Curated annotation (Swiss-Prot):
Binds 2 magnesium or manganese ions per subunit. Mn(2+) 1 binds at residues 156-157. One of its GO terms (molecular function) is metal ion binding. This is Probable protein phosphatase 2C 14.
């Protein structure tokens, strides 16, 4: 009994001791001091003190890692540093740069116009109202190394310049290839046909939707071969009278309309112009894949013997022929040539005689290192055909025997080309204008 009482007292004492201990270790919430600030678990507590080393101001700081040192010129990271020395090869100034052909892109042009002249020809090409130039041309004054054998071509692009550029790059090569060993007139006509069709086929394989009208002339062995597609035209001056050597391929032409309709197509008059399928205003061209069933690439070709009364040939795009008649063109050229007795020295600088310096300047520098005879200086001027005098027709329509066009006057073929191009522009031509004039006297004899 006594032991049981002792055990109960012991348990009671232990319970009292534990209760007092818990009351000390776990104070009530009301006993927490109000001055304690809670710290967010997302923020790091700023240290109360930063140990910043005391740097000696007399101790220099190493700058080995800096990009530029004292005395170096700073270079912008956006610009490349120019090398200290350029090795430019010493070219022999007496060595001519040979070119087998001339084209629109070979010569720098200013204000949308390019012009140059050579021994027996002149060229002018100027941009119309469109944003991009679509005319091209190709001149090979010494075909197969023969100065009396030349190729001339004017190409008028539509739907872009791709077709005209392709023709200018390739047609003359195919003509030379196809004409090899050709003798009779019929063989030459077939050779030109094959060259045009091959050019068309090769361009169509590129899958480009574009087209080009063409007029070409090859002069060789006292004969002239003229071919055309579309509305580019060749006009001959024979004893002061204009003679068209080509017929424009227009959908309104009876034979062309019949051919198109026989192939299941149709010709429609849209705003005063006849058009194939109501779209294209020419019935033959290179390219125009979407109309190829009706717009063929077979040219019409003529072979003529050079005769004494043949004075010059004008090849031009429709930018000229739409506003200037054949006879007006001949009159204008004759008048320009008649007014210039001898060429000025400055004009002689623009001659091209088979060699050319590809200058980027707006003025073509002396192109040939071969000396040509200089002519005496004289006064000269350009004729404005819009202010034509009543006596002009009698003067320029006179017999060639009274005022012959001698070979040296071909120096002014370029001036005559400029006059024709300016005349067309003044009359409101909206299209690109390209004019090539060939002095046929250069190829006679």
């Amino acid at each position: 009994m006594t032991n049981k009482l002792r055990s109960e007292e012991t348990i009671t004492s232990l319970s009292s001791f534990m209760a007092s201990t818990l009351s000390i270790a776990s104070p009530s919430p009301c006993s927490i001091p109000l001055s304690v600030t809670k710290v967010s678990p997302l923020k790091r507590k700023r240290p109360t003190h930063l140990n910043i080393p005391d740097l000696n101001p007399q101790q220099p700081i190493s700058t080995d890692y800096f990009r530029f040192r004292e005395g170096d010129a700073k270079v912008s990271p956006l610009k490349r540093k120019r090398p200290a020395h350029l090795n430019i090869p010493d070219l022999n100034p007496q060595q001519p740069i040979r070119t087998d052909y001339f084209s629109f892109t070979d010569f720098a042009h200013q204000n949308g116009t390019v012009s140059f002249g050579g021994n027996g020809f002149g060229v002018v090409s100027r941009n119309g109202k469109k944003k991009f130039m679509e005319d091209t041309h190709r001149i090979v004054p010494c075909l197969v190394g023969n100065s009396k054998k030349s190729f001339f071509g004017v190409y008028d692009g539509h739907g872009g310049a791709k077709a005209a550029e392709f023709v200018a790059e390739n047609l003359h090569k195919y003509v030379v290839e196809m004409m090899e060993n050709c003798k009779g007139k019929e063989e030459k006509v077939e050779a030109f046909k094959a060259a045009f069709l091959r050019t068309d086929r090769d361009f169509l394989e590129k899958g480009v939707v574009s087209g080009a009208c063409c007029v070409t002339a090859v002069i060789q062995d006292q004969e002239m071969i003229v071919s055309n597609l579309g509305d580019c035209r060749a006009v001959l001056c024979r004893a002061g009278v204009a003679e068209a050597l080509t017929d424009d391929h227009k959908p309104g032409r009876d034979d062309e309309k019949e051919r198109i309709e026989s192939q299941g197509g149709y010709v429609d008059n849209h705003q005063g112009a006849w058009r194939v399928q109501g779209i294209l205003a020419v019935s033959r061209s290179i390219g125009d894949a979407h109309l190829k069933k009706w717009v063929v690439a077979e040219p019409e070709t003529r072979v003529l013997e050079l005769e004494q009364d043949m004075e010059f040939l004008v090849l031009a795009s429709d930018g000229l022929w739409d506003v200037v008649s054949n006879q007006e063109a001949v009159y204008t050229v004759l008048h320009v040539l008649a007014q210039r007795k001898t060429p000025k020295e400055s004009e002689e600088e623009n001659l091209v005689q088979g060699f050319v310096n590809m200058s980027p300047s707006s003025k073509l520098r002396r192109a040939s290192l071969v000396k040509s005879p200089r002519c005496a200086k004289s006064q000269s001027y350009y004729y404005n055909s819009e202010n034509e005098s009543p006596s002009l027709n009698r003067e320029i329509g006179s017999s060639p025997s009274k005022s012959p066009i001698t070979p040296w006057k071909s120096l002014w073929a370029k001036a005559a080309c400029k006059e024709l191009a300016n005349l067309a522009a003044k009359r409101g031509s909206m299209d690109d204008i390209t004019v090539v004039i060939i002095d046929l006297n250069h190829y006679k004899g």
